[in-house]
From Swiss-Prot:
It comes from the Bacteria. One of its GO terms (biological process) is glutathione biosynthetic process. HAMAP family: Glu_cys_ligase. Gene3D superfamilies: 3.30.590.20. Belongs to the glutamate--cysteine ligase type 1 family. Type 1 subfamily. Pfam families: Glu_cys_ligase (PF04262). The keyword Magnesium does not apply. Pathway: Sulfur metabolism; glutathione biosynthesis; glutathione from L-cysteine and L-glutamate: step 1/2. The keyword ATP-binding applies. This is Glutamate--cysteine ligase. InterPro entries: Gln_synth/guanido_kin_cat_dom, Glu_cys_ligase, Glut_cys_ligase. It comes from Vibrio parahaemolyticus serotype O3:K6 (strain RIMD 2210633). One of its GO terms (cellular component) is cytosol.
Amino acid sequence: MTDFAARLKKVASNPEVFKQFGRGVERETLRYRQDGHLATTPHPEGLGSAFTNKWITTDFSESLLEFITPVSHDIPELMAQLKDIHHFTQTKMGEEKMWPLSMPCYVGSEDDIQLAQYGSSNSAKMKTLYREGLKRRYGSLMQIISGVHFNFSFPESFWDALYGEQDEQARQDTKSAAYFALIRNYYRFGWMIPYFFGASPALCGSFIQGRETKLPFESIGGTLYLPKATSLRLSDLGYTNSAQSVLKIGFNSIDQYLEGLGDAIRRPSEEFAKIGVKVDGEYRQLNTNILQIENELYAPIRPKRVAKSGEKPSDALSRAGVEYIEVRSLDVNPFSAVGVSEEQVRFLDLFLTWAALSDSDPMDNCELECWRDNWNKVIISGREKGLMLQIGCQGERLSLQDWAKRVFVELRQIAVEMDSAAGGDAYQAVCDKLEAWIDNPELTISGQLLELTKELGGLGKVGCALGMKFREENLAHGYQHYSQDIMETEVASSVEKQRKAEESDTLSFDEFLENYFAYLKQ
Protein backbone atom coordinates (compact mmCIF):
# COMPACT_ATOMS: atom_id res chain seq x y z
CA MET A 1 0.00 0.00 0.00
CA THR A 2 1.34 3.45 -0.93
CA ASP A 3 1.71 6.19 1.68
CA PHE A 4 -1.18 8.01 0.00
CA ALA A 5 -3.44 4.94 0.16
CA ALA A 6 -2.54 4.32 3.80
CA ARG A 7 -3.34 7.93 4.74
CA LEU A 8 -6.63 7.84 2.81
CA LYS A 9 -7.59 4.60 4.57
CA LYS A 10 -6.96 6.22 7.97
CA VAL A 11 -9.07 9.27 7.15
CA ALA A 12 -11.86 7.24 5.52
CA SER A 13 -12.16 5.08 8.65
CA ASN A 14 -14.26 7.97 10.04
CA PRO A 15 -16.75 8.95 7.30
CA GLU A 16 -17.77 12.04 9.30
CA VAL A 17 -14.43 13.64 8.37
CA PHE A 18 -15.62 14.29 4.81
CA LYS A 19 -18.80 16.00 6.05
CA GLN A 20 -16.95 18.52 8.19
CA PHE A 21 -14.70 20.41 5.76
CA GLY A 22 -14.84 24.18 6.32
CA ARG A 23 -15.47 26.19 3.14
CA GLY A 24 -15.97 29.83 2.29
CA VAL A 25 -16.11 31.80 -0.96
CA GLU A 26 -15.05 35.38 -1.74
CA ARG A 27 -16.31 36.52 -5.13
CA GLU A 28 -15.37 39.81 -6.82
CA THR A 29 -17.42 41.48 -9.55
CA LEU A 30 -17.48 44.92 -11.16
CA ARG A 31 -20.66 46.98 -11.26
CA TYR A 32 -21.35 48.17 -14.78
CA ARG A 33 -23.89 50.37 -16.53
CA GLN A 34 -26.55 49.65 -19.14
CA ASP A 35 -24.13 50.63 -21.92
CA GLY A 36 -21.53 48.12 -20.74
CA HIS A 37 -19.20 50.72 -19.24
CA LEU A 38 -17.82 50.61 -15.72
CA ALA A 39 -20.14 52.18 -13.14
CA THR A 40 -18.75 55.37 -11.61
CA THR A 41 -21.46 55.66 -8.93
CA PRO A 42 -20.64 55.26 -5.22
CA HIS A 43 -21.14 51.92 -3.47
CA PRO A 44 -24.96 51.45 -3.31
CA GLU A 45 -26.32 52.93 -0.09
CA GLY A 46 -28.75 50.03 0.32
CA LEU A 47 -25.81 47.67 0.87
CA GLY A 48 -24.73 49.46 4.03
CA SER A 49 -21.11 50.14 4.92
CA ALA A 50 -18.46 48.51 2.75
CA PHE A 51 -16.16 48.96 5.75
CA THR A 52 -18.14 46.79 8.16
CA ASN A 53 -20.75 44.70 6.27
CA LYS A 54 -19.58 41.12 6.85
CA TRP A 55 -21.01 39.78 3.59
CA ILE A 56 -20.86 42.64 1.06
CA THR A 57 -17.84 44.91 0.72
CA THR A 58 -15.61 46.38 -1.99
CA ASP A 59 -12.14 45.43 -3.11
CA PHE A 60 -9.89 47.92 -4.92
CA SER A 61 -12.43 50.33 -6.37
CA GLU A 62 -15.87 51.68 -5.47
CA SER A 63 -17.26 49.67 -8.38
CA LEU A 64 -15.55 46.37 -7.47
CA LEU A 65 -17.97 44.47 -5.25
CA GLU A 66 -16.75 41.62 -3.07
CA PHE A 67 -19.10 39.03 -1.58
CA ILE A 68 -17.95 36.96 1.39
CA THR A 69 -19.75 33.87 2.67
CA PRO A 70 -19.30 32.67 6.24
CA VAL A 71 -17.64 29.30 6.86
CA SER A 72 -19.97 26.47 5.88
CA HIS A 73 -19.68 22.68 6.24
CA ASP A 74 -22.28 21.93 3.58
CA ILE A 75 -21.89 22.68 -0.13
CA PRO A 76 -25.59 23.32 -0.94
CA GLU A 77 -25.71 25.68 2.06
CA LEU A 78 -22.56 27.48 0.83
CA MET A 79 -24.07 27.98 -2.63
CA ALA A 80 -27.40 29.12 -1.13
CA GLN A 81 -25.59 31.75 0.95
CA LEU A 82 -23.72 33.01 -2.10
CA LYS A 83 -26.89 33.14 -4.21
CA ASP A 84 -28.80 34.99 -1.49
CA ILE A 85 -26.03 37.60 -1.22
CA HIS A 86 -26.08 38.09 -5.01
CA HIS A 87 -29.88 38.39 -5.01
CA PHE A 88 -29.96 41.00 -2.26
CA THR A 89 -27.15 43.01 -3.87
CA GLN A 90 -28.78 43.04 -7.30
CA THR A 91 -32.01 44.41 -5.79
CA LYS A 92 -30.03 47.42 -4.51
CA MET A 93 -28.22 48.19 -7.77
CA GLY A 94 -30.97 49.76 -9.87
CA GLU A 95 -30.22 49.19 -13.56
CA GLU A 96 -26.56 48.36 -12.94
CA LYS A 97 -25.35 44.80 -13.45
CA MET A 98 -22.51 42.59 -12.27
CA TRP A 99 -19.74 41.98 -14.81
CA PRO A 100 -19.57 38.18 -15.27
CA LEU A 101 -15.94 37.95 -16.41
CA SER A 102 -12.59 38.18 -14.63
CA MET A 103 -11.17 40.65 -17.15
CA PRO A 104 -12.73 44.13 -17.28
CA CYS A 105 -13.65 45.56 -20.66
CA TYR A 106 -15.27 48.96 -21.21
CA VAL A 107 -13.33 50.95 -18.64
CA GLY A 108 -12.36 54.17 -20.39
CA SER A 109 -9.42 55.83 -18.68
CA GLU A 110 -7.82 54.78 -15.40
CA ASP A 111 -9.17 58.03 -13.96
CA ASP A 112 -12.67 56.54 -14.20
CA ILE A 113 -11.67 53.90 -11.65
CA GLN A 114 -12.47 55.46 -8.29
CA LEU A 115 -10.74 54.07 -5.22
CA ALA A 116 -12.93 52.31 -2.67
CA GLN A 117 -14.07 54.59 0.16
CA TYR A 118 -14.73 53.32 3.68
CA GLY A 119 -15.49 56.41 5.76
CA SER A 120 -13.53 58.83 7.92
CA SER A 121 -12.10 56.55 10.63
CA ASN A 122 -8.34 56.07 10.66
CA SER A 123 -8.66 52.37 9.75
CA ALA A 124 -10.97 53.26 6.86
CA LYS A 125 -8.63 55.96 5.56
CA MET A 126 -5.72 53.52 5.78
CA LYS A 127 -7.61 51.04 3.57
CA THR A 128 -8.13 53.71 0.91
CA LEU A 129 -4.53 54.93 1.17
CA TYR A 130 -3.29 51.37 0.66
CA ARG A 131 -5.30 51.34 -2.57
CA GLU A 132 -3.83 54.71 -3.58
CA GLY A 133 -0.43 53.06 -3.19
CA LEU A 134 -1.47 50.13 -5.37
CA LYS A 135 -2.74 52.56 -8.02
CA ARG A 136 0.52 54.50 -8.10
CA ARG A 137 2.65 51.35 -8.05
CA TYR A 138 0.88 49.16 -10.61
CA GLY A 139 -1.91 51.20 -12.19
CA SER A 140 -5.62 50.82 -11.49
CA LEU A 141 -6.51 48.58 -14.42
CA MET A 142 -4.67 45.56 -13.04
CA GLN A 143 -6.42 46.03 -9.70
CA ILE A 144 -9.96 45.66 -11.06
CA ILE A 145 -9.39 42.19 -12.49
CA SER A 146 -11.88 39.98 -10.65
CA GLY A 147 -11.34 36.56 -9.15
CA VAL A 148 -12.83 34.03 -6.79
CA HIS A 149 -11.07 32.99 -3.58
CA PHE A 150 -11.88 29.67 -1.95
CA ASN A 151 -11.17 29.24 1.75
CA PHE A 152 -10.78 25.67 2.98
CA SER A 153 -9.98 23.85 6.20
CA PHE A 154 -9.92 20.28 7.45
CA PRO A 155 -11.82 19.40 10.65
CA GLU A 156 -10.13 18.23 13.86
CA SER A 157 -11.37 14.72 13.06
CA PHE A 158 -9.12 14.72 9.96
CA TRP A 159 -6.03 15.37 12.08
CA ASP A 160 -7.20 12.88 14.71
CA ALA A 161 -7.45 10.17 12.05
CA LEU A 162 -3.95 10.85 10.72
CA TYR A 163 -2.04 11.65 13.91
CA GLY A 164 -4.08 10.44 16.88
CA GLU A 165 -4.56 12.53 19.99
CA GLN A 166 -2.07 15.36 20.53
CA ASP A 167 -1.64 18.15 23.04
CA GLU A 168 -2.54 21.66 21.88
CA GLN A 169 0.96 22.79 20.84
CA ALA A 170 1.76 19.53 19.02
CA ARG A 171 -1.55 19.71 17.14
CA GLN A 172 -0.91 23.32 16.16
CA ASP A 173 2.55 22.43 14.84
CA THR A 174 1.23 19.35 13.02
CA LYS A 175 -1.54 21.29 11.29
CA SER A 176 0.78 24.10 10.20
CA ALA A 177 3.32 21.62 8.79
CA ALA A 178 0.57 19.71 6.97
CA TYR A 179 -0.98 22.84 5.45
CA PHE A 180 2.46 23.92 4.18
CA ALA A 181 2.91 20.43 2.69
CA LEU A 182 -0.44 20.97 0.92
CA ILE A 183 0.74 24.39 -0.31
CA ARG A 184 3.92 22.85 -1.79
CA ASN A 185 1.82 20.30 -3.65
CA TYR A 186 -0.47 23.08 -4.82
CA TYR A 187 2.53 24.75 -6.46
CA ARG A 188 3.50 21.40 -7.99
CA PHE A 189 0.12 20.35 -9.35
CA GLY A 190 -2.27 23.30 -9.02
CA TRP A 191 -1.90 24.12 -12.72
CA MET A 192 -4.88 21.80 -13.10
CA ILE A 193 -7.08 24.59 -11.73
CA PRO A 194 -6.39 27.06 -14.58
CA TYR A 195 -6.48 24.15 -17.04
CA PHE A 196 -10.03 23.17 -16.07
CA PHE A 197 -11.41 26.45 -14.75
CA GLY A 198 -9.32 29.26 -16.28
CA ALA A 199 -11.77 31.72 -17.84
CA SER A 200 -9.62 34.48 -19.30
CA PRO A 201 -8.17 33.29 -22.64
CA ALA A 202 -9.06 36.70 -24.11
CA LEU A 203 -9.12 40.35 -23.11
CA CYS A 204 -10.37 43.63 -24.49
CA GLY A 205 -7.68 45.36 -26.53
CA SER A 206 -7.97 48.51 -24.42
CA PHE A 207 -6.62 46.52 -21.48
CA ILE A 208 -3.07 46.42 -22.85
CA GLN A 209 -2.89 49.85 -24.48
CA GLY A 210 0.54 51.27 -23.82
CA ARG A 211 1.86 48.01 -22.39
CA GLU A 212 4.51 45.97 -24.15
CA THR A 213 3.77 42.31 -24.77
CA LYS A 214 5.56 39.64 -26.78
CA LEU A 215 2.55 37.32 -26.72
CA PRO A 216 1.27 36.37 -30.21
CA PHE A 217 -2.28 37.66 -29.84
CA GLU A 218 -4.98 37.09 -32.44
CA SER A 219 -8.03 39.34 -32.61
CA ILE A 220 -11.80 39.28 -32.90
CA GLY A 221 -12.88 42.88 -33.37
CA GLY A 222 -11.47 44.72 -30.37
CA THR A 223 -10.81 41.50 -28.47
CA LEU A 224 -7.33 39.99 -28.24
CA TYR A 225 -6.90 36.31 -27.47
CA LEU A 226 -4.39 33.49 -27.40
CA PRO A 227 -5.88 30.41 -29.10
CA LYS A 228 -4.70 27.95 -26.43
CA ALA A 229 -4.64 30.20 -23.33
CA THR A 230 -6.56 29.39 -20.17
CA SER A 231 -6.08 32.28 -17.73
CA LEU A 232 -4.47 35.54 -18.83
CA ARG A 233 -5.57 36.85 -15.42
CA LEU A 234 -2.80 34.72 -13.91
CA SER A 235 -0.23 35.75 -16.52
CA ASP A 236 2.17 38.70 -16.47
CA LEU A 237 -0.57 40.71 -18.20
CA GLY A 238 -2.94 40.06 -15.32
CA TYR A 239 -2.73 40.32 -11.59
CA THR A 240 0.93 39.60 -10.95
CA ASN A 241 3.67 41.69 -9.49
CA SER A 242 7.14 41.79 -11.06
CA ALA A 243 8.48 43.97 -8.22
CA GLN A 244 7.99 40.98 -5.94
CA SER A 245 10.13 38.66 -8.06
CA VAL A 246 13.15 39.46 -5.85
CA LEU A 247 11.36 38.05 -2.81
CA LYS A 248 12.29 34.54 -1.75
CA ILE A 249 9.43 33.34 0.42
CA GLY A 250 9.65 29.64 1.22
CA PHE A 251 6.91 27.17 2.06
CA ASN A 252 8.82 24.45 3.91
CA SER A 253 7.64 25.56 7.35
CA ILE A 254 5.64 28.28 9.02
CA ASP A 255 8.87 29.76 10.43
CA GLN A 256 10.49 29.96 6.99
CA TYR A 257 7.35 31.54 5.53
CA LEU A 258 7.03 34.12 8.31
CA GLU A 259 10.72 35.00 8.04
CA GLY A 260 10.37 35.61 4.30
CA LEU A 261 7.19 37.62 4.73
CA GLY A 262 8.79 39.67 7.51
CA ASP A 263 11.69 40.50 5.20
CA ALA A 264 9.29 41.49 2.40
CA ILE A 265 7.37 44.05 4.45
CA ARG A 266 10.63 45.60 5.68
CA ARG A 267 12.65 45.62 2.45
CA PRO A 268 12.82 49.08 0.84
CA SER A 269 12.12 49.55 -2.87
CA GLU A 270 14.10 52.12 -4.84
CA GLU A 271 11.37 52.17 -7.47
CA PHE A 272 8.55 52.84 -4.99
CA ALA A 273 10.65 55.39 -3.09
CA LYS A 274 10.43 57.60 -6.21
CA ILE A 275 6.66 57.89 -5.65
CA GLY A 276 7.13 59.42 -2.21
CA VAL A 277 4.97 58.81 0.86
CA LYS A 278 3.58 62.21 1.82
CA VAL A 279 4.05 64.87 -0.83
CA ASP A 280 2.73 68.43 -0.42
CA GLY A 281 0.63 67.27 2.53
CA GLU A 282 -1.04 64.42 0.58
CA TYR A 283 -0.33 60.74 1.21
CA ARG A 284 0.56 58.68 -1.86
CA GLN A 285 1.21 55.27 -0.29
CA LEU A 286 1.62 53.71 3.15
CA ASN A 287 5.41 53.34 2.85
CA THR A 288 8.11 52.71 0.22
CA ASN A 289 8.79 49.03 0.95
CA ILE A 290 8.29 46.26 -1.62
CA LEU A 291 5.08 45.44 0.24
CA GLN A 292 3.15 48.26 1.92
CA ILE A 293 1.39 45.62 4.03
CA GLU A 294 1.29 41.82 3.89
CA ASN A 295 -1.89 41.74 1.78
CA GLU A 296 0.10 43.12 -1.16
CA LEU A 297 1.98 39.82 -1.52
CA TYR A 298 0.84 38.16 -4.74
CA ALA A 299 0.34 34.42 -4.29
CA PRO A 300 -1.90 31.73 -5.84
CA ILE A 301 -2.49 30.24 -2.38
CA ARG A 302 -2.06 31.61 1.14
CA PRO A 303 -1.87 30.10 4.63
CA LYS A 304 -4.35 31.94 6.84
CA ARG A 305 -5.68 32.38 10.36
CA VAL A 306 -8.53 34.63 11.43
CA ALA A 307 -6.81 37.64 12.99
CA LYS A 308 -7.88 39.44 16.12
CA SER A 309 -8.81 43.12 15.89
CA GLY A 310 -5.72 45.12 14.89
CA GLU A 311 -3.59 41.99 14.44
CA LYS A 312 -1.44 41.57 11.30
CA PRO A 313 -1.98 38.31 9.35
CA SER A 314 1.58 37.15 10.11
CA ASP A 315 1.11 37.83 13.83
CA ALA A 316 -2.03 35.69 13.80
CA LEU A 317 -0.11 32.84 12.12
CA SER A 318 2.76 33.22 14.56
CA ARG A 319 0.39 33.19 17.54
CA ALA A 320 -1.63 30.08 16.72
CA GLY A 321 -0.50 28.50 13.44
CA VAL A 322 -2.31 27.88 10.15
CA GLU A 323 -6.09 27.59 10.49
CA TYR A 324 -7.10 27.34 6.83
CA ILE A 325 -5.81 27.97 3.32
CA GLU A 326 -7.02 30.47 0.74
CA VAL A 327 -6.98 29.32 -2.90
CA ARG A 328 -6.60 32.39 -5.13
CA SER A 329 -6.22 30.91 -8.63
CA LEU A 330 -9.87 30.74 -9.66
CA ASP A 331 -11.07 33.00 -12.43
CA VAL A 332 -14.70 34.09 -12.23
CA ASN A 333 -16.77 31.33 -13.83
CA PRO A 334 -18.61 33.14 -16.67
CA PHE A 335 -21.22 30.38 -16.86
CA SER A 336 -22.39 30.77 -13.26
CA ALA A 337 -24.58 33.62 -12.01
CA VAL A 338 -22.54 33.63 -8.79
CA GLY A 339 -19.08 33.23 -10.36
CA VAL A 340 -18.39 29.68 -9.15
CA SER A 341 -20.21 26.35 -9.44
CA GLU A 342 -20.93 23.51 -7.04
CA GLU A 343 -18.87 21.22 -9.31
CA GLN A 344 -15.83 23.47 -8.90
CA VAL A 345 -16.18 23.38 -5.12
CA ARG A 346 -16.36 19.58 -5.19
CA PHE A 347 -13.25 19.36 -7.35
CA LEU A 348 -11.39 21.63 -4.93
CA ASP A 349 -12.48 19.38 -2.04
CA LEU A 350 -10.95 16.43 -3.89
CA PHE A 351 -7.81 18.20 -5.06
CA LEU A 352 -6.95 19.84 -1.74
CA THR A 353 -7.55 16.59 0.15
CA TRP A 354 -5.30 14.80 -2.35
CA ALA A 355 -2.62 17.50 -1.95
CA ALA A 356 -2.73 17.01 1.83
CA LEU A 357 -2.60 13.20 1.73
CA SER A 358 0.14 12.91 -0.92
CA ASP A 359 3.87 12.96 -0.20
CA SER A 360 5.29 16.49 -0.23
CA ASP A 361 9.05 16.86 0.00
CA PRO A 362 10.66 20.17 0.99
CA MET A 363 11.04 22.61 -1.91
CA ASP A 364 13.85 25.09 -2.51
CA ASN A 365 13.49 28.29 -4.55
CA CYS A 366 14.97 26.67 -7.65
CA GLU A 367 12.37 23.89 -7.61
CA LEU A 368 9.59 26.40 -6.93
CA GLU A 369 10.59 28.32 -10.08
CA CYS A 370 10.46 25.11 -12.13
CA TRP A 371 6.90 24.44 -10.96
CA ARG A 372 5.94 28.05 -11.64
CA ASP A 373 7.18 27.54 -15.19
CA ASN A 374 4.60 24.75 -15.58
CA TRP A 375 1.88 27.10 -14.36
CA ASN A 376 2.97 29.71 -16.93
CA LYS A 377 2.85 27.14 -19.74
CA VAL A 378 -0.68 26.09 -18.77
CA ILE A 379 -1.81 29.71 -18.39
CA ILE A 380 -0.57 30.72 -21.87
CA SER A 381 -1.03 27.49 -23.85
CA GLY A 382 -2.75 24.94 -21.61
CA ARG A 383 -5.23 23.77 -24.25
CA GLU A 384 -2.47 22.82 -26.67
CA LYS A 385 -2.68 19.06 -27.28
CA GLY A 386 0.39 17.25 -25.97
CA LEU A 387 1.72 20.22 -23.98
CA MET A 388 4.81 18.99 -22.11
CA LEU A 389 5.39 19.95 -18.48
CA GLN A 390 8.53 19.59 -16.36
CA ILE A 391 8.73 17.07 -13.54
CA GLY A 392 10.74 19.15 -11.09
CA CYS A 393 14.09 20.51 -12.30
CA GLN A 394 15.80 17.31 -13.45
CA GLY A 395 14.91 17.60 -17.12
CA GLU A 396 12.17 14.95 -17.09
CA ARG A 397 8.95 15.87 -18.86
CA LEU A 398 5.42 14.52 -19.07
CA SER A 399 2.42 15.65 -21.08
CA LEU A 400 -0.29 17.57 -19.28
CA GLN A 401 -2.78 14.89 -20.29
CA ASP A 402 -0.74 11.97 -18.92
CA TRP A 403 0.04 13.80 -15.71
CA ALA A 404 -3.56 14.84 -15.08
CA LYS A 405 -4.76 11.28 -15.69
CA ARG A 406 -2.27 9.93 -13.15
CA VAL A 407 -3.57 12.36 -10.54
CA PHE A 408 -7.18 11.47 -11.37
CA VAL A 409 -6.54 7.82 -10.47
CA GLU A 410 -6.03 8.94 -6.87
CA LEU A 411 -8.67 11.69 -6.98
CA ARG A 412 -11.20 8.99 -7.87
CA GLN A 413 -10.19 6.96 -4.83
CA ILE A 414 -10.96 9.99 -2.66
CA ALA A 415 -14.21 10.60 -4.56
CA VAL A 416 -15.41 7.06 -3.81
CA GLU A 417 -14.83 7.61 -0.08
CA MET A 418 -16.46 11.06 -0.09
CA ASP A 419 -19.52 9.75 -1.94
CA SER A 420 -19.73 6.79 0.41
CA ALA A 421 -19.76 9.18 3.37
CA ALA A 422 -22.29 11.59 1.87
CA GLY A 423 -24.46 9.16 -0.07
CA GLY A 424 -24.87 9.58 -3.82
CA ASP A 425 -22.20 9.94 -6.50
CA ALA A 426 -21.63 13.71 -6.79
CA TYR A 427 -17.84 13.55 -6.37
CA GLN A 428 -17.39 10.68 -8.83
CA ALA A 429 -19.62 12.54 -11.31
CA VAL A 430 -17.26 15.53 -11.11
CA CYS A 431 -14.33 13.20 -11.83
CA ASP A 432 -16.19 11.74 -14.82
CA LYS A 433 -16.93 15.18 -16.24
CA LEU A 434 -13.49 16.72 -15.75
CA GLU A 435 -11.56 13.65 -16.85
CA ALA A 436 -13.32 13.98 -20.21
CA TRP A 437 -11.93 17.54 -20.38
CA ILE A 438 -8.35 16.27 -20.14
CA ASP A 439 -8.38 14.92 -23.71
CA ASN A 440 -10.93 17.46 -24.94
CA PRO A 441 -9.59 20.93 -24.06
CA GLU A 442 -12.40 22.62 -25.98
CA LEU A 443 -14.72 21.48 -23.16
CA THR A 444 -12.81 23.44 -20.50
CA ILE A 445 -14.26 26.75 -19.34
CA SER A 446 -11.64 28.74 -21.30
CA GLY A 447 -12.38 26.64 -24.39
CA GLN A 448 -16.12 27.24 -24.11
CA LEU A 449 -15.67 30.97 -23.42
CA LEU A 450 -13.38 31.48 -26.41
CA GLU A 451 -15.89 29.71 -28.67
CA LEU A 452 -18.68 31.97 -27.38
CA THR A 453 -16.47 35.04 -27.86
CA LYS A 454 -15.95 34.11 -31.51
CA GLU A 455 -19.65 33.40 -31.94
CA LEU A 456 -20.79 36.75 -30.50
CA GLY A 457 -17.98 38.80 -32.04
CA GLY A 458 -16.04 39.96 -29.01
CA LEU A 459 -15.54 39.64 -25.28
CA GLY A 460 -17.49 42.80 -24.45
CA LYS A 461 -20.57 41.37 -26.14
CA VAL A 462 -20.19 38.14 -24.19
CA GLY A 463 -19.92 40.06 -20.92
CA CYS A 464 -23.00 42.17 -21.64
CA ALA A 465 -25.09 39.17 -22.74
CA LEU A 466 -24.17 37.01 -19.75
CA GLY A 467 -24.44 39.97 -17.36
CA MET A 468 -28.02 40.63 -18.50
CA LYS A 469 -28.89 36.93 -18.16
CA PHE A 470 -27.42 36.69 -14.65
CA ARG A 471 -29.09 39.94 -13.54
CA GLU A 472 -32.48 38.38 -14.29
CA GLU A 473 -31.41 35.08 -12.70
CA ASN A 474 -30.21 36.74 -9.50
CA LEU A 475 -33.32 38.93 -9.23
CA ALA A 476 -35.60 35.91 -9.71
CA HIS A 477 -33.77 33.89 -7.06
CA GLY A 478 -35.75 33.34 -3.85
CA TYR A 479 -33.96 33.32 -0.50
CA GLN A 480 -32.77 29.83 0.47
CA HIS A 481 -30.61 30.52 3.53
CA TYR A 482 -30.96 34.15 4.59
CA SER A 483 -34.01 36.42 4.33
CA GLN A 484 -34.66 40.04 3.42
CA ASP A 485 -34.88 40.88 7.13
CA ILE A 486 -31.53 39.25 7.91
CA MET A 487 -29.82 41.10 5.06
CA GLU A 488 -31.38 44.47 6.00
CA THR A 489 -30.40 43.94 9.64
CA GLU A 490 -26.76 43.44 8.60
CA VAL A 491 -26.93 46.60 6.47
CA ALA A 492 -28.19 48.66 9.44
CA SER A 493 -25.68 47.04 11.78
CA SER A 494 -22.80 47.81 9.41
CA VAL A 495 -23.74 51.49 9.24
CA GLU A 496 -23.83 51.65 13.05
CA LYS A 497 -20.46 49.89 13.34
CA GLN A 498 -18.89 52.37 10.93
CA ARG A 499 -20.32 55.29 12.92
CA LYS A 500 -18.87 53.90 16.16
CA ALA A 501 -15.48 53.35 14.54
CA GLU A 502 -15.43 56.96 13.40
CA GLU A 503 -16.42 58.24 16.83
CA SER A 504 -13.88 56.14 18.71
CA ASP A 505 -10.75 57.52 17.02
CA THR A 506 -8.51 59.48 19.39
CA LEU A 507 -5.36 59.76 17.25
CA SER A 508 -4.66 61.89 14.21
CA PHE A 509 -4.17 59.92 10.98
CA ASP A 510 -0.43 60.63 11.08
CA GLU A 511 -0.22 59.27 14.64
CA PHE A 512 -2.32 56.25 13.72
CA LEU A 513 0.03 55.32 10.86
CA GLU A 514 3.07 55.94 13.06
CA ASN A 515 1.70 53.48 15.63
CA TYR A 516 0.65 50.90 13.04
CA PHE A 517 4.06 50.79 11.37
CA ALA A 518 6.09 50.93 14.58
CA TYR A 519 7.17 47.33 13.86
CA LEU A 520 9.20 48.57 10.88
CA LYS A 521 11.54 50.37 13.28
CA GLN A 522 12.15 47.37 15.53
